[in-house]
Amino acid sequence: MGVYSCVGVTEQSLLRYADSARTAQQLISQTLTQLSGYALLLLTSRRQATLAEGALALARQSVVQAAEAVRALQAPEPAAHHYHHMRGAADMLLEACVAATACRGAQDRSDRRFDTLICALRATSDHLRATARLLPGFELIDFGQACCAVHAPRLPGQGL
């Protein structure tokens, strides 16, 4: 009584890590969604996305917060692989933000800067998916797999 076993200490540190990491992962995921929306706007709109500049500024702030949150994590040994992917997601999200900023004003959709942006967004998403497989509680939501997605009746003229 009152003495912690090695297993108990590890479990407690893992729970503390998971709690802190979940908050950071949610911030990364939300910011990834913001940057992906901004990228979609850049790629599909012929006009400059001046209204979206505020969204990009907020995304920049969120990217910095997410990176700081990940750097502050103290991963116990059992969470080292998970932490590796959290760092990867935060790093790639920073790259995506830099790339999104660089894409402003690009007129040609075949511009290499868009490739850099898309690659960084995809890599961030890949790292987030890896975190979902490594520890419980980090699963990403796939609305395409929701029960209503399979059973919802399709109306005439509604795509696939």
Feature roles, as predicted:
Residues M1-E53, A99, C103-L160:
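C-terminal amphipathic alpha-helix
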Residues L56-V63, M86-L93, L121-S125:
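Short amphipathic alpha-helical coiled-coil/interface segments
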Residues A49-L56, H81-R87:
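A ubiquitous short alpha-helical element
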Residues Q65-M86:
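Short, solvent-exposed, charged loop/turn and helix-capping segments
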Residues L27, T31-Q34, Y38, A59-A69, ...:
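Amphipathic, well-ordered alpha-helical segments in soluble domains
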Residues C6, S45, A59-S62, E68, ...:
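Generic structural signal for short, flexible, solvent-exposed coil/loop and linker residues
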